[in-house]
Amino acid sequence: SAVTGDACFYYENLATGVCFGHAADKPVVAASVIKLAVLIEAFRQMDADAVRANEMFVIARTDKLPSCGALNYLHDGLCVTFRDLCVLMTILSDNTATNLLIKRLGIGNINDTLRMLGAEKMTLNRLLFDREASSRGIENYITAREAGLLLKRLYDGEAVSGPASEDMLSILKDQRLNGKIPFLLPHSVKIAHKTGEDDGITHDVGIVYARQPFIVCFCGEHVSPPEFERAMQDITLMLYENAERIR
């Protein structure tokens, strides 16, 4: 109640099925959480042999995007595999890797897979840093509940195949941007999660592998990021401590 702006929240206990939320069905601008949908479609196409994990991409200067990631800072002409693009997109939120993947996979295919998984509001409408589309009000959208749905599909081994779902979770567990959901938790706790940020926007959605594992999704738009991120940290710690007490 102390957080200003559109603060959306979803929680699901993966041991008991108990779930609750606040504004969990409200669409908000996705920022980098949309990369979770790109990751799932990438692994679906690898599973279907539509793309190879070792397919090579040459990173041109014109491919490079600012802000998050590493590729923008590396030499032109660098060769990177398809799977490595998936890893960079996920653990460093690399924007260059993301747009290369979206172009290879197809926006329509990504959205079709979202619908197949049961996500009706989560939508990829444009590439990242598409200023022309953004100026016309075209954005990518998520909801806290549907981010949780994708995480549940991964946890249950149903996002693609069981092995592909497990592989994606292993990548998400290697996340390097850990200032939100994981911040107050013991370093030994495994957390598979994806963050997102933009002006007045901060998100983090993930699975916390406590004694009773749980999904927690925070999506904040028109918020003060420091204020909402502190709320994320405090709420996650409370949920974790409760999950550790339950036998």
Residue ranges and their predicted role:
Residues 1-24, 208:
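A short, well-structured edge-of-sheet supersecondary motif
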Residues 3-6, 99-151, 155:
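Mid-domain, small-residue-enriched loop/turn segments at the edges of structured enzyme/sensor domains
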Residues 17, 29-57, 216:
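Active-site SXXK
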Residues 19, 104, 149-179, 188-190, ...:
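Structured C-terminal helix/loop/strand segments within mature extracytoplasmic catalytic/sensor domains
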Residues 21-28, 75, 136-137:
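A short glycine/serine-rich beta->alpha loop
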Residues 48-74:
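Short, glycine/proline-biased beta-turn/loop segments that scaffold the active-site neighborhood
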Residues 64-99, 140:
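Conserved catalytic neighborhood of penicillin-recognizing serine enzymes
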Residues 81-85, 93, 97, 101, ...:
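Stable alpha-helical elements in mature extracytoplasmic
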